[in-house]
Each structure stands twice: as structure tokens, then as C-alpha cells.
Amino acid sequence: MNLNRYVIAGGLSLAFHALLLITTDEAQVFAMPAGNPTQSVSINMVSMPKVAPAQPEQTQTEQSKPESVKPTPVQEVVKTPPAKPKVKPHKPKPQTVKKPVPAEQVPSKSVAKPQPEKVERTAETAQKPAPTPNQQPSQPTAASQGITSQPILVDKPALVSAQVQPRYPRIARKRGIEGTVMYEIWLDAQGNQIKQQLLSSSGTEALDQSALEAIKQWKFSPHILDGVPVAHRIHIPIRFKLEG
């Protein structure tokens, strides 16, 4: 009876230890493969030597993983080539700007030389006509003075005949237009009219024209100065006014 107990107890202990060994093997098997529980169970049921080929699978997976990490340096290579294109700076431009500066100095010298020549020539021409009036005898007549230079102004001209009264324009009468016009008349030594100049207008062209037509018909006697008739000029104001 005691032997049977020992045998049974020894068998139980062996079975218990066998189970422990199996469970430890199962724990190792579950740690090795990643995500394949069905395969690990079938391997444990057959035999232990099949656990060894599971290790190269891990090495293969470990070797395959770093291969996926390698493409990162490729991005760094892409950044470098388009970064610094040297197209914008053009060095020949400042050279073209500096060249014309000395060219401007050259014509300035050539221009400066002919200037005194022109001045000398003009001075010579100006000096040449100077002796001509000295050579000619002074023969100024009263008539020539009235044409070339401004004659003297006479306040009270002498009329030969009665003045012709200017005509009052009909349009100005109907509209009630009034005004005063003044003309300057140039006369030669004989008293003949040379020039008529409007000094101040009446504000209406019709009145100014009517006064001018009347003045042109006036005749003046010569103005005598120191016993010599001279050219002169006079101012004639004409006033247009409606009565009543």
C-alpha cells in the first residue's frame, strides 16, 4: 500500500513538473512570435525543436525594419540643389556706367575752344559798323526822326481844317452803349499822319472803329520847334455819350 502511494505521488510530481516545463515553454513561445497565437499552440503540442526556427523570423523582421528607416536621408539631398541659383547678379552693368564719364570731359574741352573765336568775331563785326556813322555826315531830317525814333508828345495839336465828327453807331444807340476811346497819332514834320495806335478802348469795338475812321480824316499843321518843323505825336480822346 505504501509503495502504491509513493508511486502515485511520484507520478503526480512528475506530471506536475512536466506541466510546469510545458507552461514555461509556452511562455517563451508566446513571447517570440508577434501576433500569431494559433501557430504557437500547434507547435507546443508536437515537439520542442520547432521553437528554434521561430528565432530567425524575428531576425528577419528586425533586419527588414531598418530598411524602411533608410529613405529619410533622401529628403535631405533634395533640399540642397535648388537653394542657391546664382543668376541675378550681373557684374558687367556697373562697368558700362563708368565708361561714359571720361567721354563727357573730352567734348567739353573742344566746345570751350571755339567759344572765344565766336566772341572775337562778333566783337570785330560790332566794331566795324561803329566808324560808319562817324564817316557819314550827320544829316538827320525831321521826317526821318518821326519814323525811326519816338517823336515828342505835343499837348495841343494845331488843326488845319475843322474836325470831322465821329458817327455814333446805330447798334450802340439802340443798346444805350456809351464810352470813351483814346488814340495816339504820329505825325511827321509836315503834319501828315503816319501811325494810329489805340491807347484805351471804350469797351465796344463799334465805338472804337467809328472814332478811328473820323480821326484818319483830320489834317494837322506842322509842329515847329526852335524854328524847325519836327515830327511829333498827339493824344486824341473821343467820348460817346447819349443825350437825354
From Swiss-Prot:
Identify a single GO molecular function assigned to this protein.
energy transducer activity
Q: Which residues lie on this side of the membrane: Periplasmic?
A: 24-244
Q: What's a single GO BP term from this record?
A: siderophore transport
Q: Where is region (Disordered) located?
A: 51-146
Question: Cytoplasmic side of the membrane: what ranges?
Answer: 1-6
Name a single GO cellular component: outer membrane-bounded periplasmic space
Record PROSITE patterns: TONB_CTD
Tell me the subunit arrangement: Homodimer. Forms a complex with the accessory proteins ExbB and ExbD.
The record's listing under NCBIfam families reads: tonB_Cterm
What name does the UniProt record give this protein? Protein TonB
Supply the source organism's classification. Answer: Bacteria, Pseudomonadati, Pseudomonadota, Gammaproteobacteria, Vibrionales
Encoding gene (name) = tonB
